[in-house]
Amino acid sequence: MHHNSQSLSSGHIRSPEDENVAPIGNLKHRTGSLSHISSAHPRVALSDVTNIVATNSSNNSISKPKVAPIKERLDSAAIIEEERLDANSVAQRKEADHNDLLTDREQEEPVEDDGESEEDEEEDQEPLLLQHYASDTLVWEHAFRTYYRTTLDPNDDDVYDVVMVAELSNEIFEYMRKLEDLYKPNPYYMDKQPELRWSFRSTLIDWIVQVHEKFQLLPETLYLCINIIDRYLCKEVVPVNKFQLVGAASLFIAAKYEEINCPTIKDFVYMSENCYSRNDLLDAERTILNGLEFELGWPGPMSFLRRISKADDYEHDTRTLAKYLLESTIMDHRLVSAQPSWLAAGAYFLSKIILGQNQWSLAHVYYSNYTQEQILPLATIILENCRYASKRHNAIWRKYSSRRYLHSSQIVAKWIALAEHRVERSN
């Protein structure tokens, strides 16, 4: 449901002037970098990031780790495998879902700092890419023969919902899968950014998630915003003092594209703590759109998530839990170039495991277009990130701790704690 956005900076009635449009005198065609935008501002909301670069420019050069950390991924894979094979644990999982949830204090215990070497190791982790196996074709063909229909099924409720466009759904999703590959960012773009690191991207996204939640925007707006940022950074070098400006302008663009009533320029200036002016944001908006050649048709994962949930008759709890798991993926730079349909499938698959529904049926293969073998590596990384939620995606964890999202993040945290205990006990 779309939400009406209210200004956070003032309560009076706005003038008829449309502040989402730049003044006529400033409509100058600009492309390329953001260097023409003034940077003479008293402070930056991401000052912790800026100060790191300003005080020690040598940090811009990322050292290569000797050994990549693999223990977390192995432990996460063991948890998934244990839960898939242990049929007797279903009752325990259901009990865990209804027990008292973890408190904020328990979840947000300080994470032990292993020093700069651990941060560098995380910076240098390779992107996760979708793999195709020989058995995938056979499984997909079987699912296609079972569930594909040349005519509409009168027993399918979607046929009677004009919004679902059931007669064109197959062609629509086939086209969307082409778009997700067309607008896929380069996973190595950070190598060409002399002043930025992947950790800076995580800090920016953490702030964007909070602003997005404050404005009560649609999930599609958040995912499109992240895609705009990543694609723009693939094309242009951005200085660290303009990085937050790129994030704010990208969220403004995404809100215009996805929302019925998007926040105003004044709202974004307020949320950036007046670090940037109205004209700065409008100039950045034009620069980014010109850099992307106004190509904003990236499909995003939410439509694919709803499509997959059709295999379970649009079951609400599974999809809500999957939304948390899906949103956690935006923080991981290893998944920058991952297809949104694959991310949706991985989040939904892991959600089913957490809720004790261990079967990835032919219906799930058909509606997701992915087999269980293709999803397992992705689900392992998602689970790994959720095991260290306060470190990896604290703002997202807090967001999904609320009743509005059925306390999804707390349910996942408690399930992980119980699953780890069972794995340790079995060893």
UniProtKB/Swiss-Prot annotation:
Keywords of this entry: Cell cycle, Cell division, Cyclin, Mitosis
Alphabetized SMART domains for the sequence: CYCLIN, Cyclin_C
Ranges annotated as biased composition (Polar residues): 1-12
Gene Ontology CC terms, in alphabetical order: cyclin-dependent protein kinase holoenzyme complex; cytoplasm; lipid droplet; microtubule organizing center; nucleus
Recorded GO MF terms: cyclin-dependent protein serine/threonine kinase regulator activity
CDD domains: CYCLIN_CLBs_yeast_rpt1, CYCLIN_CLBs_yeast_rpt2
Region (Disordered) location: 1-29, 89-126
Regions of compositional bias (Basic and acidic residues) in chain numbering: 89-105
Gene3D superfamilies noted in UniProt: Cyclin-like
Record-stated family: Belongs to the cyclin family. Cyclin AB subfamily.
Other comment: Present with 892 molecules/cell in log phase SD medium.
Protein name: G2/mitotic-specific cyclin-3
Native species: Saccharomyces cerevisiae (strain ATCC 204508 / S288c) (Baker's yeast)
UniProt lineage: Eukaryota, Fungi, Dikarya, Ascomycota, Saccharomycotina
Gene that specifies this protein: CLB3
